[in-house]
Amino acid sequence: GNAVPIVQTGSKGIYLGYMKIHLDKVGKQRFSYRLIPVDSRLDSRIDPAFASKLGYYSEQLKKSMNEVLGYCPSALRKGSPQGTLGNWAADSMVEMCEDVFGVTPDLAICNNGGLRAEIPKGDVTRSDIYAVFPFDNKMTLLELTGTSLLKFFDSMAVNTEPLSAGVRLVIKDGAVKSVSVGGKAIDPKAKYKICTIDYLVESGRYSLDENTSRQDS
């Protein structure tokens, strides 16, 4: 078939790509391109009226994002198989699940890939929290059978994700040797409530889509 050019301007929506492709009669081609920062104009002029209006909202946003929400006594870091940041995030999800759904889950699961920044020691601002959690994920409450939950933990031997307190997982030689929730071995016939995010349920990487019930925030 015909060759189709596929181009990309990078990531995070920083640039707009502009490309010219020149074709002559014998099929030879040449091209030129440039990257245009999305915060600039083609003619480099700044509209004073728009800049004034944007400045007002920028100041309001800055005030909100710089608001101190809490204090972190020690830095929260990512880690594998477990890190303090991921464990804190998963434990926080347990508390949030109680507020949002009125249910205390048996465990909470988040994903390392979704934690995009670490939290240093000191004051924690709203901006810090958005840096850690930049995605618009929904909190999801699932009910899984013990059999499906065991399948999930089997996959954790390869792709470890942060878990809430109360989960003990022993992995050796790439395989799960033992797992317990709340100090008890998992009963394959029992049902467990898991708090997670919609992304992990729909990613297809785990058995979370085998849930018997689901609620989204």
Whereabouts are the PLM-identified features?
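Short Gly/Pro-enriched turn/cap motifs at secondary-structure boundaries
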Residues: Q8-K12, Q82-T84, Y130
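Hard-cation-handling environments
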Residues: P37-V124
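Active-site-adjacent helix-turn-beta-strand microarchitecture at beta-sheet edges
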Residues: G1-S64, M156, T160-L163, V170-V179
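Feature captures C-terminal
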Residues: A3-V4, Y15, N87-S217
